[in-house]
């Protein structure tokens, strides 16, 4: 089966593309969850756009007219394939016939966009929340980036500004005579509702709205004034002792931002864009005290439950996220510090609202500047983004949705499509997404509801209905209707297994399992999750591999399953499930990105790609192992978070000798340039901007490569080592070969 075709056309990929006919068969044979990854704003030239509203089923499913509906032109009726409800076509469909069908009924139009004829809403709002406790040079770089963004934001979009240090300042941009701001203390535990009431007192209720143009003003009307304010912003004047951290009221800043937007612009698309240069040390949401002798929490302390502020801060930021969801606004965090800023505590706030999370060393580092600029990249004079969105799932009667994993929040809409079991954010068939872009991808998990052995009479269908406001203020409804086949119940058991195996998508399955493992990591011990992954893998290959009982040498996997164990091996070793070399903030960032990207990007995170460049031939993919390292070649590693160029020992010596500057060694210059060009292409396309590293063999930064590759050559290896090929990795970790041998042993045993 061509799994990529469905992704290219509809932005969806399923783990199983043939479905068993009953719940019993599914329990026995679907040893990876039945699910899919769906990208609502997937861009494809095949997507049809129409300027009229959709036609919905009058039954309980509320599904939308699609190519799989049965129509009766003489009677002007159609039958919904989801609930089998008979519906009447409205008068404007009077000309419908077998030869004259509207776009939504054409067989190839499985994804369609409706432009709803509603009044256009104001363009998205951008509220900047700026940390002024950072060093002067970084503050200058940050304000330069913000000034640059004003030229990229549509001129009719509203913008606002909040700065925070020991105090929080809300700027009244509508007052242009001079910079005017309202100051809030950073330390009292003031809640959002009290702040909203305080704002009502600042101005009468009639003036506390978007049209009043006090705190939120269109870019076209305030660009000069806001630019002058940004140019004059100074570092927080509060004196900081040498043994203290700056007083940083991050929580209060978020409270003020949330109160402003929920009061002034409720249910209008918008973003709270927070630029944070250190941990919160005062007021609600603090993650560490101002005393430098007290270190910020580590993974060890989190696991042991010995953190002082984490639980309370997490609940505080989560409540901010829930209120932002209610008012329809996303929260973005740009964490730019060598120290942790509290992403671990803030992660749920960003996830619930569908915001961005960027992790960088400083505000003048390309990881921040390039990532921030990319957010405002336009295509066809518009941002490819959606705001204030809702994703709804409709299923055939024999299929139920168990839940979703991604950056969204539940609408608590328990319809007939909702299954008994919950996976991820479950108990609902619709989810709120405050902001999404072309890469925003959601994992949906399903269960077979049919209790009979015979195949269901209706088609196996899933319909995704996504409503959102685009960056131009128009209301769009995108509908994707996906069909999959049922296994024929007349087949023998082995034929059923073969048919299921042919429909197995190992790449999508690996990503669905990775998301589920990361979701479990929020509440379960990491060793337990690793054992669960191993157990599920053994069950899967035992069911679908060819082998003789108790004979590991006879074990063989068909091509549809052959790479899946490799994915699981690298997932077990990844930063998602191994936290030894990561801080809680870094782990939160890695897991956050896994839960928002599509299949191809997620696979790069799970099993990074390695490209080899040498004089012996053109560049080619290389196995991710220690044996791929050689002294006379260059490697390009892409982990999604890092892009690394690794020069072998001989290549590094030649480069240091300046051979690439000699016209007689043009081939060597071309060899050095090739990975740089490929790396530049990756950096240009990737969001957020990854860490770019160029290193030599045996250098300190080579550790990024050695920590990623399969350690098939270690200090304990008994085989003789050719010094020109391979690299010894000093680790006790199990390598891929040993992992696969143990897998075969457990899979074939009686």
From Swiss-Prot:
- Check the record and name the InterPro entries matching this protein: ADF-H/Gelsolin-like_dom_sf, Gelsolin-like_dom, Gelsolin-like_dom_sf, Sec23, Sec23/24_helical_dom, Sec23/24_helical_dom_sf, Sec23/24_trunk_dom, Sec23_24_beta_S
For biological process, the GO terms are: COPII-coated vesicle cargo loading; intracellular protein transport
Please give the GO cellular component terms listed in this UniProt entry: COPII vesicle coat; endoplasmic reticulum exit site; endoplasmic reticulum membrane; Golgi membrane
Query: In this record, what's one Pfam family?
Result: Sec23_trunk
Provide the topology term for how it sits in the membrane.
Peripheral membrane protein
| Localization of this protein | Cytoplasmic vesicle, COPII-coated vesicle membrane; Endoplasmic reticulum membrane; Golgi apparatus membrane
Give the superkingdom in one word. Eukaryota
Q: Which UniProt keywords apply?
A: Cytoplasmic vesicle, Endoplasmic reticulum, ER-Golgi transport, Golgi apparatus, Membrane, Metal-binding, Protein transport, Transport, Zinc
**Molecular-function annotations in GO:** GTPase activator activity; zinc ion binding
Q: Does the keyword ATP-binding apply?
A: no
- Briefly state the protein's biological role: Component of the coat protein complex II (COPII) which promotes the formation of transport vesicles from the endoplasmic reticulum (ER). The coat has two main functions, the physical deformation of the endoplasmic reticulum membrane into vesicles and the selection of cargo molecules.
Q: Which family does it belong to?
A: Belongs to the SEC23/SEC24 family. SEC23 subfamily.
User: Subunit comment for this entry?
Assistant: The COPII coat is composed of at least 5 proteins: the sec23/24 complex, the sec13/31 complex, and the protein sar1A or sar1B.
Q: Name the chain's protein.
A: Protein transport protein SEC23
Q: Per the UniProt entry, what species is this protein from, by scientific name?
A: Dictyostelium discoideum (Social amoeba)
**Upper taxonomic lineage:** Eukaryota, Amoebozoa, Evosea, Eumycetozoa, Dictyostelia
Q: Which gene encodes it?
A: sec23
